[in-house]
Amino acid sequence: GDAELTPEAVKLLDSVADAIYQYNDNYITIEGHTDSNPISTAKYPDNMMLSVHRAHSVYNYLVNNKGFDAKTMTSSGRGENVPIADNTTAEGRAQNRRVEIKIYNNLNSDIQ
């Protein structure tokens, strides 16, 4: 497992960024996910750390390359805790290795 953006991921992220840039002033969260296979490397001691790095790679790309406002974005890792597919198959594990970008409506700041 790795958190580096591949050329294919950058191409997809460019398309996504162009589509969601109009929501740049909304609150945006970026969540990294992994499959359930244990990982233990010097760079990523566990799946949680790998998922954090995956999300932060996307966050950094959007801020540094696409002009997104860092003040309205957060990144976090969920590890293997929120699967969307069966981790017992290669296809399911591949689906679980992902980054999700969520956009939230701005709340009325006058309410205290």
Indicate where each model-derived feature is located.
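Periplasmic OmpA-like peptidoglycan-binding domain that tethers envelope proteins to the cell wall
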Residues: 2-23, 33-112
